[in-house]
Amino acid sequence: MLGTAYWETNRTMLPVEEAYWLSDAWREKNLRYYPWHGRGFVQLTWKANYQKASAKIGVDLIGDPSRAMEPDAAAQILVHGMIGGWFTGKKLADYIDGARVDFVGARAIVNGKDKAAEIAAIATAYLAALPEDQGSIWLRIFKAFWGIITGKKQ
């Protein structure tokens, strides 16, 4: 998830809007899925995906697609969408579980094989940077977060 968020936000780790350096008029003219263009940590696109995310997280993203830029909504879309397979039907557990970590394959959760090796390298760097010891605050935070998302205590 961290590798995906890093990549999809143009390395900012902040929710961004697709082609944020261009005007909204440009997006309206050039993006066939406007106004449901890429937003957030994962670049949620297409009306059907906005409808699905809206129903799942309880935020009206159809009436106001820009709400996908709100950090809380963007985080929920990233996490629940990747775990639940909202984007392509592929889920995080299809590639990462207690026995294996396939960051290259995991790109299929969001966007096929597009830049999979580059994003996998980023994810690997994040994984290596997180301390492994049981006393680590990061490990405890991740385990608590994972438990909330999956409903399983760690």
Regions found by a protein language model. Name each.
Residues 1, 14-18, 88-99:
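Surface-exposed patches in mature extracellular/periplasmic domains of secreted proteins
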Residues 1-3, 100-107:
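Alpha-helical scaffolds flanking conserved acidic
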Residues 1-82:
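Peptidoglycan-targeting cell-wall enzymes and recognition modules
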Residues 28-30, 55, 72, 89, ...:
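Extracellular cell-wall/glycan-interacting regions and their flexible linkers
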Residues 41, 89, 107:
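A residue-level signal for beta-strand positions that form part of recognition/binding surfaces
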Residues 62-66, 73, 90-96, 100:
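Long, well-ordered alpha/beta core segments of mature domains
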